[in-house]
């Protein structure tokens, strides 16, 4: 078996594994400190005293961007933002409503460069249950499968840094500081939003330009549902008038995003491996175990 035979203090992760340090890690995994960017579809209401009466008021409007920062456990809002996209990935996800003692959960796949391949998910399956390949006749599928596919969302995952314009807190109070260059992840899963957010990347691809060299301004547009409710989609504007410099700090942030995706994919793959074997028939599981035994004997 190949092992690292030279001590490299600049590569802690690889050396720690070789030196048997991995087993000393705390079993309680640290939560991701990457801020989450979303669109806030519903207004946040507050109360104010007007002429001696307490009245309900809208303190944060619907259609604002919401940034959840786990480091401080705070959430910030802004009607307009500017993002510097470093990279994008693609995945599938499906919400599963809990019943009884079973909690709500998301079935999620690994992240990939495209959706043109089968993606392992955290339940031991592929594509969150969506059949592999192109579906020529959706209506010919069994009704249960049609319903399952309707629940599965394509997700465009954006990694970058964000500037919030005139940010507020959840009470609608203006912040006394700027919120700039904050690393974030944005899972874009609404169909129209998926398309809109992808347009700047398509434009840059045609021009053979890298997304990290430009900014994208983001606001929102309102949409109406048949029942009268509203939701919002991103309104994005790619700014190619300024080419942003790439210094060592940008390189470090980019590497941290790549590491984040690697760690996420390793976790999903580990879940897939555990549950895929458990989902096999007893005969298939025995066959897998036999292969593992043979492989182990050869290795030793």
Q: Each predicted region: which residue ranges?
A:
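Generic hydrophobic, helix-prone segments enriched in Leu/Val/Ile
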Residues: 37, 84-85, 114, 158, ...
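Extended serine/threonine-enriched, polar tracts that run as long, contiguous segments within proteins
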Residues: 153-241
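Accessory, usually C-terminal, subdomains that scaffold auxiliary metal cofactors
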Residues: 215, 219-290
């Amino acid at each position: 078996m190949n092992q690292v035979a030279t001590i490299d203090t600049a590569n802690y992760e690889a050396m720690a594994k070789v030196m048997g340090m991995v087993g000393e890690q705390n079993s309680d995994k640290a939560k991701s400190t990457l801020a989450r960017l979303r669109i806030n579809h519903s207004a946040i209401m507050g109360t104010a005293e007007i002429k001696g009466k307490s009245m309900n008021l809208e303190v944060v409007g619907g259609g604002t961007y919401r940034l959840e920062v786990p480091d401080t456990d705070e959430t910030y809002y802004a009607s307009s933002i500017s993002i510097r996209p470093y990279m994008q990935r693609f995945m599938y996800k499906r919400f599963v409503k809990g019943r009884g003692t079973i909690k709500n959960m998301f079935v999620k796949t690994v992240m990939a460069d495209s959706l043109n391949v089968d993606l392992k998910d955290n339940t031991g399956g592929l594509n969150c249950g969506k059949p592999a390949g192109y579906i020529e006749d959706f209506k010919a599928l069994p009704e249960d499968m049609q319903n399952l596919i309707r629940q599965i969302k394509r997700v465009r995952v954006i990694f970058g840094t964000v500037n919030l314009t005139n940010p507020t807190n959840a009470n609608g109070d203006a912040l006394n500081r700027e919120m700039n260059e904050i690393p974030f992840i944005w899972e874009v899963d609404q169909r129209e939003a998926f398309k809109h957010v992808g347009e700047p990347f398509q434009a840059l691809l045609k021009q053979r330009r890298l997304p990290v060299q430009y900014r994208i301004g983001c606001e929102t547009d309102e949409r109406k549902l048949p029942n009268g409710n509203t939701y919002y989609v991103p309104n994005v504007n790619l700014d190619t008038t300024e080419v942003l410099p790439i210094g060592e700090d940008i390189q470090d942030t980019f590497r941290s995003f790549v590491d984040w995706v690697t760690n996420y994919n390793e976790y999903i793959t580990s879940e897939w491996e555990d549950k895929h074997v458990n989902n096999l028939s007893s005969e298939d599981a025995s066959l897998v175990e036999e292969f593992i035994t043979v492989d182990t004997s050869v290795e030793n």
